[in-house]
Amino acid sequence: IYACEFFYDEEGLACWPKLDVNFTNKTQFVYRINKGVLDVSDDKTLNDSMPDDSKRIPFTNMIYVGDGLSDVPCMKMMRTYGGQAIAVYQEENRQGVEDLLSKGRVDFIFPADYREGTALDSTVKNIIRKMAICDTLAEENAAQFRQIGRSPLPYQASLFEET
């Protein structure tokens, strides 16, 4: 989870923003998580080409929860690369997130209620279970291919990817 970081004085009091993530660099931070390049000064590694199987956190194992228009590019990116996007809202903003859902920019919309037992909580837990099942099936499939001395077929992996 990225948001911001503060510079603290010797007494442990926050005295100045050290890092903030705004609408213009949110997608960059999603790529940083994807590639495992968390050093914000390391743009070279971030922009280097990297094979998908070397990426630390695949998009298919990401859930992006956003609450505003500044999150739409990341939500769209999540959906494009196989992750999940959830828009949360205050009741007065429901129409806007309904539009995101109807245009395929998000997978789900929920009130911004993060408490245990809410529809948002249940759905996030179900998505995580789905991700775990897909990973388990892909590992079993790859193990069986290894047992017969072969590599998985190119299309085989897609059978277990989230859509």
What would you call each of these model-derived segments?
Residues 1-163:
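C-terminal cap/substrate-recognition subdomain and adjoining C-terminal extension
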